[in-house]
């Protein structure tokens, strides 16, 4: 039984970044939407995307790209609160659930994540390389479904990219 629990837990973790994966996100977001309808505790969804990651990977290789993914995941995990969760959604995209936050606090945390990632650098030979992220966020509303909440945050993330990257846009 213990081995089964272990393998079930491993099935919810991204092996490269060691953060929760998309399957874990799908389980968690459904539960949180249900709880919101019952208890009315606000929470936020952030969608984070590493800016120009494909170009970075093409130029510096997948090994360094993997280091970047691990580092960004770790930075996000270290920046958010213990009650929050980070998930690798796929590729260079991460999703963060911020529990018990309003729009203002969610925005502050998102900006803090953005700035922390911006401070990190990666050594490749004699070069110090940096990456940035764009973040879109949304606060849960009464009418939200799993897809509507994600779509709002994802759209906001693309607005952040289109506005010049390395920034946060919160959906209203």
What are these regions (language model features)?
Residues 8-9, 22-42, 73-81, 99:
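Short regulatory alpha-helical coupling segments
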Residues 117-133:
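Catalytic core regions of nucleotide second-messenger enzymes
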């Amino acid at each position: 039984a213990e081995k089964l629990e272990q393998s079930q837990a491993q099935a919810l973790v991204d092996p490269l970044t060691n953060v929760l994966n998309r399957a874990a996100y799908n389980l968690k977001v459904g539960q949180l939407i249900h709880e919101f309808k019952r208890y009315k505790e606000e929470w936020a969804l952030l969608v984070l995307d590493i800016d120009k990651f494909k170009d970075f990977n093409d130029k510096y290789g997948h090994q360094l790209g993997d280091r970047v993914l691990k580092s960004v995941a770790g930075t996000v995990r270290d920046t958010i609160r213990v009650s929050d969760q980070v998930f690798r959604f796929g590729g260079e995209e991460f999703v963060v659930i911020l529990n018990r936050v309003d729009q203002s606090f969610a925005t502050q945390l998102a900006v803090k994540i953005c700035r922390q990632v911006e401070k990190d650098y990666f050594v490749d030979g004699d070069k110090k390389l940096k990456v940035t992220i764009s973040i879109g966020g949304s606060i849960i509303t009464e009418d939200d479904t799993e897809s509507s909440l994600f779509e709002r945050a994802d759209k906001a993330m693309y607005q952040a990219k289109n506005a010049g990257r390395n920034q946060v846009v919160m959906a209203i």
